[in-house]
């Protein structure tokens, strides 16, 4: 049976959605209709939200799952009248944390995501700009400033991984696509050799690579299984020859790939 899940907040909804998605992902056999509802910051909006929740409960024949990070007590009381299974993230964790720290929390909306009070904001922007400027081997003369350089065949997940590490951790990550010439020579390009200690390889199952490339260039040599199988085989040979640590991205999320890379390379996050 498909269930409905709401991620509700009187701020951006980032925290409710992130934690909620992580928890729901543990129930792989259950399909969910997921809805994010940010800025539920007035009583009128809260009452309208209750109507949405109750309508979903009536439609589905089972109550929706509600993840919320609402700070305002009056709004929380309105939300509690809904026919939903409520998981109040702040009240669940803040109360025991207040007891442990013997201090009251500020109950500030959007505190962790604010720009003005966040010293990490410019670090994040600079890391994202670095990832974009050094994407797909477009520029190589700034590799000395890179924390990491991801290498692999085209369309194996290098770009989204670099951007995720930039946005979440302030990591300056470049990426370089290894070409058919590189593979046939079984040699790293000269520009990568001098930065060997920063290299990390991504590989992927050939059938998955074929499907991804087919969406971009259908019925082409580039997207053929034979070509994808050749490139993956040769790039893995190159990784072994050059002793480049690597991971197969096929069955991992970008979050998991990023975490594994940082652990294996021993790269410290600029912020957490």
From Swiss-Prot:
Protein's UniProt keywords contain Nucleotide-binding: yes
Lineage: Bacteria, Pseudomonadati, Pseudomonadota, Gammaproteobacteria, Pseudomonadales
Disulphide linkage map: none
Reactions that this protein is recorded to catalyse: [pyruvate, water dikinase] + ADP = [pyruvate, water dikinase]-phosphate + AMP + H(+); [pyruvate, water dikinase]-phosphate + phosphate + H(+) = [pyruvate, water dikinase] + diphosphate
Binding-site residues for ADP, renumbered to this chain: 152-159
Function noted in UniProt: Bifunctional serine/threonine kinase and phosphorylase involved in the regulation of the phosphoenolpyruvate synthase (PEPS) by catalyzing its phosphorylation/dephosphorylation.
Assigned keywords, A-Z: Kinase, Nucleotide-binding, Serine/threonine-protein kinase, Transferase
GO molecular function, one term: ATP binding
InterPro entries: Kinase-pyrophosphorylase (IPR005177), PSRP (IPR026530)
Name the record gives this protein: Putative phosphoenolpyruvate synthase regulatory protein
């Amino acid at each position: 049976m498909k269930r409905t899940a709401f991620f509700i907040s009187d701020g951006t909804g980032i925290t409710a959605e992130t934690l909620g998605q992580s928890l729901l992902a543990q129930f792989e056999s259950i399909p969910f209709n997921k809805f994010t509802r940010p800025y539920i910051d007035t009583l009128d909006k809260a009452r309208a939200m209750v109507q949405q929740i109750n309508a979903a409960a009536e439609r589905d024949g089972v109550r929706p799952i509600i993840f919320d990070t609402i700070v305002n007590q009056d709004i929380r009381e309105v939300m509690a009248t809904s026919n939903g299974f409520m998981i109040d993230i702040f009240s669940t964790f803040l109360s025991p944390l207040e007891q442990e720290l013997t201090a009251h929390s500020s109950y500030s909306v959007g505190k962790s995501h604010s720009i003005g009070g966040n010293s990490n904001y410019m670090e994040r922007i600079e890391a994202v700009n670095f990832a974009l400027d050094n994407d797909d081997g477009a520029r190589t003369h700034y590799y000395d400033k890179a924390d990491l350089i991801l290498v692999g065949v085209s369309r194996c997940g290098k770009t989204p991984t670099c951007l995720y590490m930039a946005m979440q951790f302030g990591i300056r990550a470049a990426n370089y696509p290894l070409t058919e010439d590189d593979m046939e020579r079984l040699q790293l390009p000269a520009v990568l050799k001098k930065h060997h200690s920063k290299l990390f390889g991504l590989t992927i199952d050939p059938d998955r690579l074929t499907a991804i490339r087919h969406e971009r260039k259908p019925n082409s040599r580039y997207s053929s299984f034979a070509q994808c199988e050749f490139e993956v085989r040769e790039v893995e040979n190159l990784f072994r020859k050059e002793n480049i640590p690597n991971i197969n991205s096929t069955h991992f999320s970008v979050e998991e790939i990023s975490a594994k890379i940082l652990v294996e390379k021993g790269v410290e996050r600029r912020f957490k």
